[in-house]
Amino acid sequence: MMSNLKLGVEVISARLKPREDYGGVNAYVELRFDDQKVITMTKIDDSSPVWNEKFFFNISDTEDLSNQFLDAYVYNKTSSITKSCLGKIRILGTAFLPYSEAVGLPYPLEKEKWSMFSSAAANGGELALKVFLTDNPSPKVPNLISTKKIPSKSRHKFHNIPTNESNHSPRGNQQSFQPQPPPPQSQTALPPPMMESSLYQAPRFGTPIPTTMGFNPNPPDYSIKETKPILGGGKRARSSDHDLVEPMEFLFIKIVKARNLPSMDLTGSLDPYIEVKLGNYTGKTKHFEKNQNPVWNEVFAFSKSNQQSNVLEVIVMDKDMVKDDFVGLIRFDLNQIPTRVAPDSPLAPEWYRVNNEKGGEIMLAVWFGTQADEAFSDATYSDALNAVNKSSLRSKVYHSPRLWYLRVNVIEAQDLVIVPDRTRLPNPYVKIRLNNQVVRTKPSHSLNPRWNEEFTLVAAEPFEDLIISIEDRVAPNREETLGEVHIPIGTIDKRIDDNRTVPNRWFSLKTENQRRVRFATTRLHLNVCLEGGYHVLDESTYYSSDFRPSMKELLSHKQPSFGVLELGILRIEGLNLSQEGKKETVDAYCVAKYGTKWVRTRTVTNCLNPRFNEQYTWEVYEPATVITIGVFDNNQINSGNGNKGDGKIGKIRVRISTLEAGRIYSHSYPLLVLRPSGLKKMGELHLAIRFSCSSMFQMLMQYWKPLLPKMHYARPLKVVQQEILRQHAVNLVAARLSRAEPPLRKEVVEYISDSNSHLWSMRKSRANLFRLSSVFSGLLGTGEWFQDICRWKKPVETTAIHIIFLVLVCSPEMILPVMSLCLFMLGVWNYRLRPRQPPHMDTRLSFADNIHPEELNEEFDTFPFSSQDPGIVKMRYERLRSIASRAQTVVGDIAGQGERVQALLSWRDPRATSIFMVLCLVSTVVLYVVPFKVFVLLAGLYIMRPPRFRGKTPPGPINFFRRLPAKTDCML
């Protein structure tokens, strides 16, 4: 008897990669379960189809449900009678969940059949399904097409059930059903179902991680958009250094100093400060104690767009314990204030008499100007007059310290003295310290130990001392210092290339109290040098902004600049709340980094649509570099935040080589942040970018030069060592920039430098796997196209290929010219399809738009020690083992194919080797007798022979190759 339990499948959407020979994708999905089959409607010419169709299957045996499975095939309808499989997925019956726990998930499509010589391969992509069990489907379950053979000729119709009421059936005679409202879904769901084609495994340990993310068929708009701002005030010619931003007018008032202010207290003293008042905005200078001639040198800037009064008041106040006393004031009519236009000279301050009977004068200057004014960067802005830490609001320019690689070769030590036990054999090792970097040699059991170990550290100018000490391990947890030496790095030799040899040096060690070691002098033999021929990497090599060496002599002579990069940071629109959700507004500022120059815009407080309109320039030395712009939420404005870091709102990268010289790129870039809750769009950053080339020839010649300095190729660093040194370099840069005023905080430097790019991420692994498949998709597509040529599926095209083949065989000298001409014509053809805007972060390429919460939870987990429950960590380990087992199988198959090639002449299979040797001897005679052109012609015609001359079984050479032995049978 058939049970009332039904299997529901909702086909949501897909993301497909079309084959080049088919052009667009006419996709539909075929579902198979328990000898039943249904198909969706066909989406014409759509690589991202959305169906939202729901189907229900009868379950014949509920007790055997765990042994059943659901197959979903995605087909491309190439014509009215032909189709091609784009991929399939299989979901096991053990993964079927109740409707209240089911969630829509994207499943990666896999090949229908895999073989080294098979052409049936999936092109990649994903299919989003929601699979659930229910005993009360909304409509009556339609008749399903059975996969078993039915003797009668009657046709069975089935009905697809759209999830939207506005969707209609794709077939005219079908009946559309109106589903009843389903029961409310729970906010907590289990991890994704176990399946053969997915990387997920259902957790069997611990508490499942809540999942609130489903597959969103209509994701937010993450694309880059072109904008048309009024740059430079609408002037076409370059009239100033701020022609990439929109002009913003400010009222500037510079308070310089005062003299002969009257005394207010009974003691005859005065604690003066000045209030600058414009409407409801009031700015205050710092106060001086008992000073009637104070010097302030402070600048206030009031936005003209927020002007609330026509009178500016400058009030002199006396700070008191109970209530501040009024000293005097000066009033200015805004209609009489002059306007200064850069690059005019600064307005000279003047003495103004305070409106007070007792006298007193203030030197100040008042004028209208724009953000191009020199006083703009040092001003206190009207939107942040009440901030406690006003220094963190200003725009500043920083420069990274010059970094060097410090190479230390610890050779040997002599005359170690053990005090007080001189008879004990020591267990010494050398410890090297520089900043926060500590390295150690291996222990050596001798009074005259020899190590001969080399270490590389990162040093930053201005240099700190290098501390080298010899430690004696007297117990497992006890060490004694036998002596140490402080080496000023400024006295160390510098090396430009590998041709120069740095001499070794002996250093005398001292004890902690700076006395010579008793009874003898302990000496340490070292080879220390500063490597000036390297570029110290403090960014990822994939999007680095500088590749120049550390030595200044190499900077100026061998790599001059050939262009200028100009960046205009206009504004941000639609900022969301901070990541904690505790702040109602955002105090946003931007940081841009290119080369060694960092720039920081002013902080616009309490604004969700801040306008910056600040412009900066950099010299360009290498086209294959990237400028990084990050947006942050300033949490240092008011006191009480402690060590709370600035919030990350998003960042973008622009590669210089993708920019056309002389063109202004004005676009709005989405600010994307990946959080444990998923991908979030924080707003849109509006930028204007222009790359100006001063020497086109020099820039083109730069493409032929090595990307890194010579020392990186003469004495290359290991990949692991280079990554460790990069982390030290980022820490050094962050430590130095955090000492500036205002400081550029450590979390900002790490976020811009992407210091965590080396950490494990399942999302990045999947993305890189699909990137790899996309790279080889063209090669696989060419192979499939050639197989279609050989099978004569397109007779006209096959005939044309035969003619071209005959021409090239008869005139082999035309092969290389024709290939070069084809590549040239392909480039000309693709010119009309060239990108019109700079590349931006692709959420689909990054697999960030539809990622499972468990993967995000793992990506944001702490390292190297996890903060998750041991059961979850064990589940992740089991999942990683499952992935590694698949990789292990693929690597083993590839190795087996190579071992079969080696087995041709290894005599592991005597008969196979004998056959191959006979074939080689026969082919030698044939190739000697038959002309080469004739041989190539016959071989090509044989390979492209018509189907009637082909068999249905693989050819003999492939059968022979598959029988060759591999070393798989020797594996344990």
Swiss-Prot record:
Keyword Metal-binding: yes
Alphabetically ordered keywords of this record: Calcium, Membrane, Metal-binding, Repeat, Transmembrane, Transmembrane helix
Biased composition (Pro residues): 179-194
Binding site for Ca(2+) 1: 265, 271, 318, 320
Cofactor(s) listed: Ca(2+)
Record-linked InterPro entries: C2_dom, C2_domain_sf, C2B_MCTP_PRT_plant, C2C_MCTP_PRT_plant, C2D_MCTP_PRT_plant, MCTP_C, QUIRKY-like
Transmembrane segments: 803-823, 924-944
Biased composition (Polar residues): 161-173
Binding site for Ca(2+) 2: 265, 318, 320, 325
Any one cellular-component term (Gene Ontology): vesicle
Location of the protein in the cell: Membrane; Vesicle
Domain C2: 1-107, 232-352, 384-507, 543-669
Disulphide bridges: none
Topological category with respect to the lipid bilayer: Multi-pass membrane protein
Expression sites (tissue/organ): Expressed in root hairs.
Primary localisation category: membrane
A Pfam family per the record: C2
Protein's job: May function as a signaling molecule by regulating the trafficking of other regulators.
Family: Belongs to the MCTP family.
UniProt protein name: Multiple C2 domain and transmembrane region protein 8
Naturally occurring in which organism (per UniProt): Arabidopsis thaliana
Lineage: Eukaryota, Viridiplantae, Streptophyta, Embryophyta, Tracheophyta
